[in-house]
Amino acid sequence: MNKVVWFEIPFDESERAQKFYKDVFGWQINHFPDMDYYAAITTDTDPHTMEPKEAGAINGGLLKRDDTGKHPVILIEVPSIDEHLKKIEQNGGKTVMLKVMVGNFGLYARVSDTEGNVIGLWEKIKQPQ
């Protein structure tokens, strides 16, 4: 079974969105300028793996709204994005954003399901111990 591991919330104005999530929920917002992306840290995170310490908790991100992400998106971790893109197409879904490398963390793609909902796929890259 594949689990939800991340979320993304689009914004139109980054400063306004950052302030909202900091002030309302107490989230820590970290900017990744090379990707124009903001990590939304919602729980204590292991500094080595960047994964939440609390079982069942997830962190996420804030990003500029675009055509593939007009609404919040959940990311589901899969062992192979390529295999899941094929499964999605075979089951009536569509690829809306091709696979891209995200830093040295993993691979990411966006798909739509049979109902038009956009979902992110995440393939984690194994980090050296």
What spans do the regions from the language model cover?
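N-terminal beta-strand motif that seeds the catalytic metal site of vicinal oxygen chelate
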Residues: 1-19, 71-74, 123-129
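Active-site beta-strand termini and strand-to-loop segments that position acidic
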Residues: 41-44, 111-114, 124
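Short acidic/glycine-enriched loop/turn segments that link adjacent beta-strands
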Residues: 34-37, 68-70, 102-107
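Core segments of cupin and vicinal oxygen chelate
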Residues: 8-56
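Short, charged/polar surface micro-motifs in flexible loops or helix N-caps
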Residues: 44-47, 67-69, 80-82
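Conserved catalytic-core motifs of GNAT/GCN5-like acyltransferases
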Residues: 28-34, 99-102, 126-129
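Vicinal oxygen chelate
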Residues: 12-14, 74-118
